[in-house]
């Protein structure tokens, strides 16, 4: 048992030594490179598929908090609405004013055209200032594949 233990200790020591040397050939990152990595633009897609004004207000608050925390120049935000959530993008909805404020701040608020078609809605029914995507779920999946962070309040 003593020989086996000595062998395992030797293997572990070798593995640790090799791991410690793994970074020796890499150049150290300059202060500018480290700062650039830290200040990389954040990209966030927010899903809203509920008709509940409370959920919408939470999503809109999330977008505002991101902009305040990171700065509007440091973050791209898309808020994608589909399914029952699309109703809050209609003119005169309970959150219409908040949506206007949000789009004015630079957040892209996007309506799913598949849902609009299913609910027999057209662009004149919808709030001014919003955008449109053919499929909300496809937009969200595409953004996640591109490395965007995903939020669903």
Where do the protein language model's features map onto the residues?
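C-terminal motif of bacterial Sec signal peptides marking the signal peptidase cleavage site
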Residues: 17-20
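N-terminal export leaders
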Residues: 1-9
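Histidine-anchored nucleotide/phosphate-binding helix
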Residues: 57-71
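A cross-taxonomic marker for long C-terminal extensions/tails that follow the last structured domain
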Residues: 92-153
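Acidic helix-start/capping segments at beta-turn-to-alpha-helix junctions
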Residues: 76-89
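Acidic/histidine-rich, surface-exposed loop or edge segments in extracytoplasmic proteins
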Residues: 38-51, 80-82
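Bacterial signal peptide processing site
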Residues: 22-24
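Short, glycine-rich nucleotide/cofactor-binding loops
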Residues: 48-60, 86-89
